[in-house]
Regions:
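Bacterial N-terminal signal peptides that target proteins for export
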Residues: 9-12, 20-29
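Bacterial N-terminal signal peptides
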Residues: 27-39
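Signal peptide processing junction and immediate N-terminal pro/mature segment
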Residues: 40-46
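Aromatic- and Gly/Pro-enriched helix-to-coil junctions and flexible linker segments
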Residues: 46-89, 99-105, 230, 234-550
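N-terminal accessory alpha/beta regions
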Residues: 91-119, 131-135
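Acidic/His-rich structured neighborhood in mature extracellular/periplasmic domains
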Residues: 118-219
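Mixed-charge (acidic/basic) macromolecular-recognition segments
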Residues: 188-258
Length: 550
């Protein structure tokens, strides 16, 4: 019941789109705190997102649209001000860009600050403010992870045209350098971001500065962190809530495109859903129980066993605890928050309303549309094919306004070509390693350790140096899950994108060959691979570049 309440409440914005919603925030916080102590549901892992191209198939990311053709603002405080300027001030006095510090986290940059972790924490930020008039919405659509010592910003931002979050990385983000923006290797990101969306820890957010012990060490290490105030659980809560809402975008898009179906009946279903979303946004009215009959009929056919609701929650982790818990690994498959056995029409309609241009909704509802009947305008949109089975887009609202003589004139930024970093090479003397591990470990980045990057001689030397840790992680496929101190490599999510189930992989000749290769490397250096699993992983020889680990 607690999870149901959490899903229904936290999936709705506490802003102008939901009357009296701010009164719910104290109750939402109590629910979240209770959930931190609740056991995980014993349900199967949520379905993994199919393999997707790194570059957007359509459109561009919200981050690209925000930056345009200009360099990424530097330093970070300037970038934060640029983002803040797109959003309305928070009525409660908090920044619209909610930001916290994580010195000992679980991201790819977890070792970038070593040995000065508290002097160089990771900055995690979520856009949580309503957009200003004429500005594309950023709320729940833009998330940042900045690391000063790593000279990098990891960006997750929404692409309305493709109905997906894009993963990007800003490299060379440092004084005297020109920041370079790339679309990241999507499969690498999805190993942890299993819903292709942002993730965050469950309460009590002990990795963040909300933990008094963490905050105390941060204050001792440094006086100023890019103008960011050390915050309590309030900021962490808002970031958590933003990731919850963002992960529901895929649910609303699925119901919009697939739930309603194709053809005229599907178009009319979407017209009814859009009309209900506008009615909720303008007047706060919820849909009737018998609304969307086409969705109800299609549900039984498309999802006879229910629709899994994505889970963005990592287990809460105290990095200062004496004993690490393997269950906190973000690579482990996560169960869905819930399985919907029937369509939650109220949540669907409220979710669609939450994806609209908030400033345009308020302006049209109060000053222009008033209580006008929108049915004729929506019918014209349907006749033109604008309600076909394609991604739900805030531009639909602008199309409705245009029907009433209020055209939307967006400022179209000239964007540089979208680009990715160099491709992985699956040839050479280490073909097996490159094939099985190159997606994550053959890159110019230091994290995760790029022991497969370079010519054959360099790769061989790096494999020698990393052999102990590679052997340890590969060997965990032959250890029962309950006895593992780390997640095995390659991650199960990466295997799944290649159509390999974990049981098949554990018995595969490929895994045996990888193990034999590193076993021989360890012995050639005078080591004993047979005893490595009895040692704590952190005591094994550090992988390259020091002190990172695979």
């Amino acid at each position: 019941m607690a999870r149901t309440a959490r899903r229904r409440l936290r999936g709705v914005r506490a802003d102008g789109l939901m009357p009296n919603a701010r009164r719910l925030r104290p109750y939402l916080f109590i629910i979240a705190m209770c959930l931190a102590l609740s056991p995980a549901w014993s349900v199967p892992a949520q379905p993994l997102v199919p393999t997707q191209p790194d570059l957007p198939p359509l459109g561009r990311s919200r981050f690209d649209q925000l930056i345009g053709n200009a360099p990424v603002p530097f330093p970070y405080a300037r970038l934060a001000r640029t983002i803040e300027a797109q959003m309305q001030p928070d009525p409660g006095g908090l920044p619209a860009l909610k930001t916290t510090l994580i010195p000992l986290g679980r991201s790819l940059q977890k070792n970038a600050g070593a040995p000065d972790f508290f002097r160089f924490p990771r900055v995690v930020a979520a856009a949580d403010g309503l957009n200003k008039a004429g500005v594309e919405p950023l709320q729940d659509r833009l998330f940042l992870g900045f690391h000063e010592k790593g000279e990098v910003i990891e960006v997750i931002s929404y692409n309305d045209a493709a109905a997906r979050f894009e993963f990007q990385i800003v490299r060379d983000y440092a004084p005297g350098k020109t920041p370079q923006v790339f679309y990241a290797r999507r499969s690498l990101c999805l190993a942890c971001h299993q819903n292709a969306a942002p993730i965050f820890a469950r309460p009590l957010w002990d990795e963040t500065s909300a933990n008094p012990a963490i905050a105390r060490r941060l204050r001792d290490a440094r006086k100023d962190f890019y103008g960011i105030k050390l915050s309590g659980t309030d900021i962490a809560y808002f970031i958590d809530a933003a990731t919850e809402r963002a992960n529901l975008f895929s649910v609303w898009q699925t119901l919009w495109q697939q739930g309603c179906g194709a053809g005229e009946s599907g178009d009319r279903c979407r017209m009814e859903a859009f009309s209900a979303a506008l009615d909720y946004a303008r007047n706060g009215r919820l849909p009737a129980a018998d609304a969307l009959p086409t969705l109800a009929r299609n549900w039984k056919i498309r999802w006879p066993h229910g629709l899994p609701i994505p889970n963005p929650d990592l287990p809460n982790r105290d990095p200062l605890a004496a004993l690490p818990d393997a269950a906190n690994d973000p690579l482990l498959p996560r169960p869905p928050l819930a399985i919907w056995r029937a369509p939650d029409k109220t949540a669907f309609i409220v979710g669609l309303a939450g994806m609209l241009d908030t400033a345009a909704v308020k302006q049209s509802a109060v000053k222009q549309l008033g209580q006008r009947d929108l049915s004729a305008a929506l019918e014209r949109l349907r006749a033109r094919g604008e309600l076909a089975a394609r991604p739900f887009n805030p531009s639909l609202l602008h199309a409705v306004l245009a029907e009433f003589g209020m055209p939307h004139r967006p400022s179209l930024a000239r964007l540089p070509p979208a680009r990715i970093e160099a491709d992985v090479r699956f040839t050479g003397a280490h073909t097996l390693f490159r094939t099985q591990c190159g997606l994550c470990h053959d890159s110019t980045a230091n994290f995760p350790p790029n022991f497969l990057h370079g010519d054959d001689a360099a790769v061989s030397a790096r494999l020698d140096h990393c052999a102990e840790r590679i052997f340890y992680r590969l060997s965990l496929w032959h250890v029962t899950a309950a006895r593992r101190s780390k997640s095995p490599m390659p991650p199960s999510s990466i295997l799944a994108t290649r159509g390999i189930d974990v049981e098949t992989w554990a018995r595969s000749p490929a895994l045996a060959a990888l193990l034999e290769d590193v076993r021989l490397r360890i012995r050639a250096q005078g080591g004993q691979p047979e005893i490595l699993l009895a040692r704590p992983f952190e005591q094994l020889r550090a992988c390259l570049p020091n002190p990172a680990a695979p």
